[in-house]
Structures are given as C-alpha cells and as structure tokens.
C-alpha cells in the first residue's frame, strides 16, 4: 500500500498536516519576589480589607510599584492562606494566628582589636570620591521615601525569615574568618 504525503498514522493522530505550525510552548511567568516594603504594605491593606476594590488595588499597586494583576493575585493567595489558618485555628481550638518564631537579632559588632579594615569606598561615612555613591546600606533618598523603619528587620511581621537566615550565614562566615585569621 502506498501512502501519499499528508496521509497515514502520523497525521491522523494529531501530527502536523500541510500548512499547520507546531504549537508554541506556553510562556510560564517567573515567580514574583516581593520586597519587605511591598509585603508590609500589602499586609497592611489586607488588614484593612480582605476584598479591596479595583480602585484600591490600583492605588496600592502604584504605591508598591507592582502591576495591579500581581496585587490581585497576592490578595487571592493571602485570602486562601487566611482561610487555611482559620480552619486550623477552629480545628485545634487555638485563638491566636500562627506566627513564625521570633529570631533574635544577631550581633555583628566586633571588638575594635578584631575588626577588619574596610576600604573607604565601602563604609557608611561620606563618599571618599565626591559624586560616587556608597555601596553599603540604603541611601538617604530611599530612607526618606520609605521611612526610617522600612529597611529594618521585621521579625514580628514574619517577613524577615530569609533575612534572618542570611544574617546567620554572615555570622558563620565571620566566625570562620576569625578562625582563619586570628588577631595579631
């Protein structure tokens, strides 16, 4: 038996026929990573209303520099989390919302004899070269925009879990440096 082009099992069962294109892969959006400031503002808005209207969502989206659809999806996910917490509380008889354990602030101050010298362009003081910004810490413009506590750890709010783990890694690294280079 002879098959002409376009006939046979390859095209009958879902293969490509003449003039058809291969289906394009569905684009998958990357996960949104929210800043501490964005999460704080979103949580504050959630405390005020679990179902904000479009105008409120658009206003909030502009405030935190996110698309409105991201804010909308955040509220959907947050409501699901809230319902899940409510179910857990009613099932266990607990009254308070589950919280992450408070992590202690880790001390990073070293005694003066053990401190490592910093290059002048890295430190928190005025720039060594005028017109060149500092590399560590938020600048005064950001502090003024977001308020004095916007960049502080917010352990009570539960948003700084990642920050706490980074601090722990930094502490371990500092201890490793102390072991590697004992003070002179």
Swiss-Prot record:
<keyword id="KW-0539">Nucleus</keyword>
<dbReference type="GO" id="GO:0000785">
    <property type="term" value="C:chromatin"/>
</dbReference>
<feature type="region of interest" description="Disordered">
    <location>
        <begin position="1"/>
        <end position="33"/>
    </location>
</feature>
<dbReference type="GO" id="GO:0005634">
    <property type="term" value="C:nucleus"/>
</dbReference>
<keyword id="KW-0225">Disease variant</keyword>
<keyword id="KW-0371">Homeobox</keyword>
<dbReference type="GO" id="GO:0000978">
    <property type="term" value="F:RNA polymerase II cis-regulatory region sequence-specific DNA binding"/>
</dbReference>
<keyword id="KW-0182">Cone-rod dystrophy</keyword>
<dbReference type="InterPro" id="IPR043562">
    <property type="entry name" value="RAX/RAX2"/>
</dbReference>
<keyword id="KW-0913">Age-related macular degeneration</keyword>
<dbReference type="InterPro" id="IPR017970">
    <property type="entry name" value="Homeobox_CS"/>
</dbReference>
<keyword id="KW-0844">Vision</keyword>
<dbReference type="GO" id="GO:0007601">
    <property type="term" value="P:visual perception"/>
</dbReference>
<dbReference type="InterPro" id="IPR001356">
    <property type="entry name" value="HD"/>
</dbReference>
<feature type="DNA-binding region" description="Homeobox">
    <location>
        <begin position="27"/>
        <end position="86"/>
    </location>
</feature>
<keyword id="KW-0804">Transcription</keyword>
<keyword id="KW-0805">Transcription regulation</keyword>
<dbReference type="GO" id="GO:0001228">
    <property type="term" value="F:DNA-binding transcription activator activity, RNA polymerase II-specific"/>
</dbReference>
<keyword id="KW-0716">Sensory transduction</keyword>
<dbReference type="Pfam" id="PF00046">
    <property type="entry name" value="Homeodomain"/>
</dbReference>
<keyword id="KW-0238">DNA-binding</keyword>
<feature type="compositionally biased region" description="Low complexity">
    <location>
        <begin position="1"/>
        <end position="10"/>
    </location>
</feature>
<dbReference type="GO" id="GO:0006357">
    <property type="term" value="P:regulation of transcription by RNA polymerase II"/>
</dbReference>
<keyword id="KW-0682">Retinitis pigmentosa</keyword>
<comment type="subunit">
    <text>Interacts with CRX.</text>
</comment>
<comment type="function">
    <text>May be involved in modulating the expression of photoreceptor specific genes. Binds to the Ret-1 and Bat-1 element within the rhodopsin promoter.</text>
</comment>
<protein>
    <recommendedName>
        <fullName>Retina and anterior neural fold homeobox protein 2</fullName>
    </recommendedName>
</protein>
<dbReference type="InterPro" id="IPR009057">
    <property type="entry name" value="Homeodomain-like_sf"/>
</dbReference>
<dbReference type="GO" id="GO:0045944">
    <property type="term" value="P:positive regulation of transcription by RNA polymerase II"/>
</dbReference>
<dbReference type="GO" id="GO:0000981">
    <property type="term" value="F:DNA-binding transcription factor activity, RNA polymerase II-specific"/>
</dbReference>
């Amino acid at each position: 038996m002879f098959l002409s082009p376009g006939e046979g099992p390859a095209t009958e069962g879902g293969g490509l026929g003449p003039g058809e294109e291969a289906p394009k892969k569905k684009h998958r959006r990357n996960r949104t990573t929210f800043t501490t400031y964005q999460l704080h503002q979103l949580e504050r808005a959630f405390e005020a209303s679990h179902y904000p209207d479009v105008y409120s969502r658009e206003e909030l989206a502009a405030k935190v520099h996110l698309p409105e659809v991201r804010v909308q999806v955040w509220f959907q996910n947050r409501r699901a989390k809230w319902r899940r917490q409510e179910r857990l509380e009613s099932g266990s008889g607990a009254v308070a919302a589950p919280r992450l354990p408070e992590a202690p602030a880790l001390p990073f101050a070293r005694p003066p004899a053990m401190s490592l010298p910093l290059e002048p362009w890295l430190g928190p003081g005025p720039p060594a070269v005028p017109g060149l910004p500092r590399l560590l810490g938020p600048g005064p413009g950001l502090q003024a925009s977001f308020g004095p506590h916007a960049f502080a750890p917010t352990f009570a709010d539960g948003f700084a879990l990642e920050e706490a783990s980074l601090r722990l890694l930094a502490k371990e690294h500092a201890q490793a440096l102390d072991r590697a280079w004992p003070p002179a």
